[in-house]
Amino acid sequence: MPTPTKGPRLGGGPAHERLMLANLATALFRHGRIKTTEAKAKRLRPYAEKLITLGKRGDLHARRQVLTKIRDKAVVHELFTEIGPRYENRNGGYTRITKIGNRKGDNAPMAVIELVEALNKPATGSKRAQTEEAASQEPAAEAGKQPAEGATSVQTAEAADASQAEGEAEEK
């Protein structure tokens, strides 16, 4: 007889439960944070933290163990090259669960589970990300122009001061 799982059951059978946890972990590692039910977030936390610990180890055996659970090679590569080394000096506690209230349709309690040190990847493809990127580039371009104009005004001011000093020296 199979040993019962700790925590709430997440689906029909054990195979479906394993697939759901693997898919949730894949989404968490890909996006850095996901919105799901509290029960799924609580079941995902230890699962994801064990995978991050394997990612910190970084050897071939650990990579193969992770590949048995997460089938997306790009996500596994990201786990071992970016996420694992980021938590090098941290002993556990890689994820945070924040409760956000109940879902509108069925009143299910919802939560956001996220990696503690957020990924520093800009979002691509969304209009909001494109406008934020454009807005951040405009001040940089203006800032690039201002020192050049300021430098010419400073140079002319220094030249004027120098000519005044010469004029005063000649008068004395």
Curated annotation (Swiss-Prot):
Low complexity biased stretches: 132-143
SUPFAM superfamilies on file: Prokaryotic ribosomal protein L17
GO molecular function: structural constituent of ribosome
Record InterPro entries: Ribosomal_bL17, Ribosomal_bL17_CS, Ribosomal_bL17_sf
This protein's name: Large ribosomal subunit protein bL17
Domain of life where this protein originates: Bacteria
GO cellular component, one term: cytosolic large ribosomal subunit
Alphabetical keyword list: Ribonucleoprotein, Ribosomal protein
SUBUNIT field: Part of the 50S ribosomal subunit. Contacts protein L32.
GO biological process: translation
HAMAP family assigned to the protein according to its UniProt record, in alphabetical order: Ribosomal_bL17
Family statement drawn from the similarity comment of this UniProt entry: Belongs to the bacterial ribosomal protein bL17 family.
TM regions (residue ranges): none
Record Pfam families: Ribosomal_L17 (PF01196)
